[in-house]
A protein has these predicted regions:
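Cyclophilin-like peptidyl-prolyl cis-trans isomerases
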Residues: 5-185
Length: 185
């Protein structure tokens, strides 16, 4: 009888302990945000989709606020397609040391020039690398998470896109992100 009572007590304790797990994180709204890019070729602004891509935007904002992007180059530029940056190694192989899950929203599409999206190596492998489209690219929908749109300075983005590149689409003259400033607007 004591053995049965002891077993029942242990089962109750075990069940109680499983209920002590971490509560799932709740998304917290962050409000509007604009990323101001200052490069050696000029400046442009991107309105971040904080209301539809909260986690992706929060990751980007955190990296920008830490100065992660300061001094990083646009390492891949393909005219009439996109410009890509965010690799600390400058060659498309690096990241922040972690990955984030893909975050898709039905209203966020690669349907125009100036769309900001996460670069990746496959599903759920985004981190710090991003690209900005130079045209509509619907084949990227559902594969790369959109999280913003250029609102000012698209001529600078186009100018970067027209950079002369080598066989690996790397600009011959470095295009450097001097700083990304996040403004609450």
């Amino acid at each position: 009888m004591k053995k049965i009572l002891l077993i029942c007590l242990l089962l109750v304790c075990a069940l109680a302990m499983t209920a002590c797990g971490k509560e799932p994180e709740k998304k917290v709204a962050m409000g509007p945000a604009t990323a101001v890019f200052t490069t050696n070729m000029g400046s442009f602004e991107i309105k971040l989709a904080t209301d539809m891509a909260l986690n992706t935007c929060a990751n980007f904002i955190s990296l920008a606020n830490k100065g992660f992007y300061n001094g990083i180059i646009f390492h891949r530029v393909i005219d009439n397609f996109m410009i890509q940056a965010g690799c600390p190694n400058g060659d498309g192989t690096g990241g922040p040391g972690y990955v984030i899950p893909d975050e898709f929203h039905k209203k966020l599409k690669h349907n125009d020039e100036g769309v900001l999206s996460m670069a990746n190596r496959g599903p759920n492998t985004g981190g710090s690398q991003f690209f900005i489209t130079l045209r509509d690219c619907p084949w990227l929908d559902g594969k790369h998470a959109v999280f913003g749109k250029v609102t000012s300075g698209m001529e600078v983005v186009r100018k970067i896109g027209r950079s002369y590149t080598d066989m690996n689409d790397r600009p011959l003259k470095k295009v450097v992100i001097e700083k990304i400033t996040i403004e609450k607007r």
